[in-house]
From Swiss-Prot:
Claim: Membrane is one of the keywords in the record: yes
Organism: Phocaeicola vulgatus (strain ATCC 8482 / DSM 1447 / JCM 5826 / CCUG 4940 / NBRC 14291 / NCTC 11154)
Keyword Transmembrane helix: yes
Classification of source organism: Bacteria, Pseudomonadati, Bacteroidota, Bacteroidia, Bacteroidales
Protein name according to UniProt: Potassium-transporting ATPase KdpC subunit
Location of this chain's protein in the cell: Cell inner membrane
Gene: kdpC
Length: 189
């Protein structure tokens, strides 16, 4: 019985430590160490909040850059964030990807099938990726410039400014946040 009480006490101590203290220490660290103090980075346009930079949104109009397709619920439903778990041999998945390629080519007639970035037709693991690679952004420059009546050089310059370098220069890859890029386009009107 003596061993049981010691074990029970130790279990309670570890439960409190790992469910409260550990999380509190991580939260305090995030408040000082990370960008945005561990909180969401809110994107504003003309004084109105248009979204959070760390959660992907659906953009389907030609005047906007598009992010990766989402498999999170119906569109970009953050409450249903998850991958589809469909593999490359799944007929339903292949049909979805083919349909996405056809849609992408319809809006980008200047590209061949081989030039369509895989990232733009396959959903991410979370289904809510806020970023695309610079190459995916540059592929869309011609469409966005034409739809907005802007020069390709102007739109490309906006993309160039939106490219974020890897963290500390070595962790990760270059990326473009789609929401921030589209907000920058709106400001450039």
């Amino acid at each position: 019985m003596k061993n049981f009480i010691k074990s029970f006490r130790l279990t309670l101590v570890f439960c409190v430590f790992f469910s409260v203290c550990y999380i509190l220490v991580l939260w305090i660290f995030a408040q000082f160490a990370g960008p945005n103090s561990g909180n969401a980075e809110v994107v504003e346009l003309n004084g109105k909040v248009v979204g959070a930079a760390n959660v992907g949104q659906s953009f389907t109009e030609d005047i906007y850059f598009w992010g990766r397709p989402s498999c999170a619920g119906d569109g970009y439903d953050a409450t249903s964030s998850a991958g589809s778990n469909k593999g490359p041999t799944n007929a339903e998945y292949l049909a979805e990807v083919e349909a996405r390629i056809d849609t992408f080519l319809k809006h980008h007639p200047y590209l061949s099938r081989k030039e369509v970035p895989a990232e733009m037709v396959t959903a991410s693991g979370s289904g809510l990726d806020p970023d695309i690679t610079p190459d995916c952004a540059y592929v869309q420059v011609q469409r966005v410039a034409k739809a907005r009546g802007m020069s390709e050089e102007t739109v490309k310059a906006i993309v160039d400014k939106a490219v974020e370098k890897p963290f500390m220069g070595i962790f990760g890859t270059e990326k473009v946040n789609v929401l921030k890029l589209n907000a920058a386009l709106e400001k450039a009107k």
